[in-house]
């Protein structure tokens, strides 16, 4: 860090502005975009993944609708600790049709594609006590690379977020995690989550 620079207070920020930041995301091209267009870049990025990128460089063809189902499930479970079994149940609950993502192997395959495309950033669990791993949660917390992608997958707007503060909270947590991860990468550090299983 540069200790010669003065720390600046950014002042207060309204919850409405945070909702807009969640939809806008960290896309440099989105900084000066009109407010009614801030969700277009994340949505276009998801569309590009589904229509072009997910099958590029691979002989195996993946189904666009299944990938969309998975992305929407990951978005619904943003900043949550969920396994593949829970993702499958989530898809069965929210999606219609017979051709669902119904096996863990298929979910793993599609998650590998998203990982290869740097679209997911699973946050590892912190564990200091190496001799007693049962005392803390070990599962990673699920994140798309930018919370604006989760918002785009779910068709969220600032107004919709403000009407659903539970979802707003998970997206805000993802925003904080994204920014802290960027700082930690610069410092060659790691960002973990912690959940104590002892009750």
Report residues per predicted region.
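Accessory nucleic acid-recognition modules appended to NTPase machines
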Residues: 31, 35-199
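Amphipathic alpha-helical "lid/sensor" segments that cap RecA-like P-loop NTPase cores
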Residues: 2-48
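Accessible peptide chain termini
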Residues: 1-2, 96
């Amino acid at each position: 860090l540069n200790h010669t620079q003065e720390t600046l207070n950014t002042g207060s920020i309204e919850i409405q502005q945070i909702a807009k930041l969640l939809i806008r995301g960290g896309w440099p091209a989105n900084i000066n975009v009109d407010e009614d267009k801030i969700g277009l870049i994340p949505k276009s990025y998801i569309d590009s993944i589904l229509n072009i990128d997910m099958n590029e460089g691979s002989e195996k063809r993946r189904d666009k609708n299944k990938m969309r189902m998975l992305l929407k499930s990951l978005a619904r479970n943003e900043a949550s600790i969920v396994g593949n079994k829970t993702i499958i149940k989530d898809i069965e609950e929210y999606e219609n049709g017979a051709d669902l993502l119904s096996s863990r192997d298929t979910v793993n395959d599609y998650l590998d594609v998203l990982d290869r495309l740097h679209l997911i950033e699973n946050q590892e669990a912190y564990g200091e006590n190496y001799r007693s791993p049962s005392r803390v949660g070990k599962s990673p917390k699920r994140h798309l690379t930018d919370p604006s992608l989760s918002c785009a997958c779910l068709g969220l707007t600032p107004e919709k977020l403000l009407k659903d503060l539970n979802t707003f909270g998970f997206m805000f947590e993802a925003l904080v995690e994204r920014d802290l991860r960027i700082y930690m990468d610069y410092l060659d550090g790691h960002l973990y989550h912690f959940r104590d299983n002892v009750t």
